[in-house]
Amino acid sequence: MKKPDIQQLKDIVNNSNQIVFFTGAGVSVASGIPDFRSMGGLYDEISKDGQSPEYLLSIDHLHDNKESFINFYHERLLIADKKPNIVHQWIAQLENQQKSLGVITQNIDGLHEDAGSHNIDELHGTLNRFYCINCYEEYSKSYFMTHHLKYCEKCGNVIRPDIVLYGEMLNQKTVFKALDKIQHADTLIVLGSSLVVQPAAGFVSEFKGDNLVIINRDATPYDHTASLVIHDDMTSVIEEIVNSNS
């Protein structure tokens, strides 16, 4: 990576006080969670089984066959042993230093929360929470995993993860909170997102602040509008920033 890019990123962060982070699947790769659509990712593995990923991750699957849906997310979605990496930790640290308004994420792995971030807008929900589809009793991930739950202890109906399935709308309260963050940000740092899947592109379009920074392995449609673009291994970039500040 180019040292001038690292220095420019440091300068932008040091001179900003209302940073908003927008994160995609690339942020969690170093935690052992492959991008859903990459080789070896969830979509790739499901497709090998001859199943449609979109159907298995849909509200229709839940309605059509509750037992199949339960077994699917127990076998494929639950990620008990994954830990936050240096990128999650850096984001949380800047929030704790009151340099950041928070993080908007497309990820469902809950690793921003695990790293210590508090002001998180999880656009697609989180696997850190579960609830009953009938009585809406809520269960934490730790309780859910420890007790190997499949059915609600209160009413006996199915428990589902608090994620947005295909066929469901995004939570509008979460969307409005995310948009408000971006509209008040002086710097928007995009990490590990291709910015091609909606609503990601729409959110970036709402940013009117001073610095748009994009750190992603591949090019995005917004690279030409950014103050700084780094196409490199994200973990290496953030390690360089953290080590230079220590």
Swiss-Prot record:
- InterPro entries according to UniProt: DHS-like_NAD/FAD-binding_dom, NAD-dep_sirtuin_deacylases, Sirtuin, Sirtuin_cat_small_dom_sf, Sirtuin_class_U, Ssirtuin_cat_dom
Q: Name the cofactor(s) required for activity, per the record.
A: Zn(2+)
Which top EC class applies here?
transferase
Residues reported in the UniProt entry to bind Zn(2+): C132, C135, C152, C155
Query: Any idea which positions bind NAD(+)?
Result: A25, F36, R37, Q106, I108, D109, H124, S193, S194, N216, D233
What function is annotated for this protein? NAD-dependent protein deacetylase which modulates the activities of several enzymes which are inactive in their acetylated form.
Name of the protein in question: NAD-dependent protein deacetylase
Source organism per entry reads: Staphylococcus epidermidis (strain ATCC 35984 / DSM 28319 / BCRC 17069 / CCUG 31568 / BM 3577 / RP62A)
